[in-house]
Amino acid sequence: MCAKRGPRTWERVNANCRHKWNREIPTITGSRPDIDGRSHVHTATRPAPSRRPARDNGAVPEAMKTTDPHPLTGAAFGSPVPPGSGWPGDPADATTPVAHSAGGAARLARSAADIPALDARVSVCRACPRLVAWREQVATTGRRASFAHEPYWGRPVPSIGPADARIYVVGLAPAANGANRTGRMFTGDRSGDWLWAAFHRAGMAARATSRYAGDGQAPVGLRMGAAVRCAPPANKPTTAEKAACLPWIARELALMPQVRVLVALGGIAWDTALRVVRQAGWGVPRPKPHFGHGAEAVLARPDGVEVTLLGSYHPSQQNTFTGRLTADMLDGVLARAAELAGR
């Protein structure tokens, strides 16, 4: 156990040894506009490791003083990665407004003028205390051993892909040691390996692999987001967390009127897509279309343009290892998406 012996000195004591070290606890201040446009000063300190995540005080997190090299670029970053610190593909900077509540997320989403602004705001969102605590705990004290010396993104993961894409893929949520580490959708885990390989076979990705942000990977003709943008404990976001994240994807689709195909990876993504478009005033078949691999539902935008929703089993290890989802099955859904999109 640890006992405090002074403002900057801690002592670890057990039955066999006594180890003493000094640790400077950094205090970093910075100014950042909140959702109402006013400037607030936030102060962040590095907490002592704990099994229980620290309560979110509403401040935008700054990097820990200890840094680790990015596995590709070699640049040093703290974890979580501060906005605008040079991480490959980071859409935000120190001036990006931050949502601290579900209502704030909805207001910031609605006011985003374009896709780059939306991506930036997504990537610094702090609307859900449980998700903020979990993603940052994993990024600091809960890293997987094989990635212990890598910096962790530790922030919400924005969508990836061109704003003029005609295919939009909806995932579930970032993996704690995957996208929560790399900062890019479906990057750094087995599910991502499967998905990007399939994209590449379909001519929808620049490369067959996606390991790190900055590795040259990029979607071609498709854009990909998720129902929830933060890694959730046990991969299970709550109903309230899914609802709080909904405005981000709603605004994204509103800014992409050329989309003709939605591909839902799993039942939660399917339900999210239907809920988003129904709230946006799209025509949705009744009764509610049921999810299934290869399922199709024809939706109608308010202007009458048809958009097809396609279902695919999620490329989780549970599905791919058991054969519930095969490469041929995933290829079939993507081929159908390409056909419907006019590619």
PLM region descriptions:
Residues G6, G30-S31, G37:
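Intrinsically disordered, low-complexity segments enriched in small polar residues
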Residues H19, H40-H42:
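Low-complexity, intrinsically disordered or signal/transmembrane-proximal segments
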Residues I25-P26:
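Intrinsic low-complexity, disordered N-terminal segments enriched in polar/charged/small residues
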